[in-house]
């Protein structure tokens, strides 16, 4: 059984017949994300619901997206316990002021862990005066990308319960895919993978999310 999934007996009703069959379900478990500066104690940022797996990427991507982590200041990312439900991100310098988040952030939406919408808006950067023109992608190729993403979703194929975020190059080639119950978590994993690889910025790339 793959990480983030669990086998379970379920009742299936087909063609007027009710029967018990074995199925594979997507599961969520809490992950406590902590951050520690060069000379300080570890501080809890959030407790994030997620399917176990790719936790290093999730924590790194979330902190980067929150503006709490600059890639060149990342020192180490690792689990703090054998159970794998707490992860610590260590920085080379001091931790910036932490956002006021609720204790638990579910997979429902990326804003749910924030204390207020005003806090979200205050953290947004000022819009650029000139919007940089991105890559040009043929419409025919662009319309093919959802099917490419869907065919690569092994977790969804097994459970029917996982979303995905995919990173494509300007030619429409799938470079990276991550799955999660929440699409924002899946995107944080993609971003986190690129941060850990030192592969930022992501200019001339396409991000694609699965739909309902």
Regions found by a protein language model. Name each.
Residues 155-211:
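Glycine- and Gly-Pro-enriched alpha-helical subdomains that act as flexible
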Residues 1-177:
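Intrinsically disordered, low-complexity regions enriched in acidic/Ser/Thr/Pro/Gln residues
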């Amino acid at each position: 059984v793959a990480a983030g999934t669990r086998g379970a007996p379920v009742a299936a009703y087909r063609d007027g017949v009710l029967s018990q069959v074995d199925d594979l379900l997507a599961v969520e478990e809490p992950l406590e994300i902590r951050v520690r500066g060069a000379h300080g104690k570890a501080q809890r940022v959030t407790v994030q619901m997620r399917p176990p797996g790719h936790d290093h990427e999730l924590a790194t991507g979330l902190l980067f997206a929150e503006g709490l982590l600059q890639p060149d200041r990342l020192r180490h990312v690792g689990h703090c316990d054998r159970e794998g439900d707490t992860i610590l991100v260590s920085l080379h310098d001091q931790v910036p002021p932490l956002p006021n988040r609720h204790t638990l952030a579910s997979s429902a939406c990326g804003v749910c862990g924030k204390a207020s919408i005003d806090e979200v808006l205050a953290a947004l950067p000022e819009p650029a005066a000139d919007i940089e023109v991105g890559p040009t992608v043929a419409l025919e190729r662009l319309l093919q990308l959802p099917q490419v993403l869907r065919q690569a979703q092994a977790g969804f194929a097994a459970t029917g319960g996982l979303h995905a975020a995919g990173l494509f190059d300007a030619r429409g080639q799938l470079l990276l895919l991550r799955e999660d119950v929440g699409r924002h978590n899946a995107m944080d994993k993609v971003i986190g993978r690129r941060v850990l690889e030192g592969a930022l910025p992501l200019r001339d790339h396409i991000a694609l999310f699965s739909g309902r």
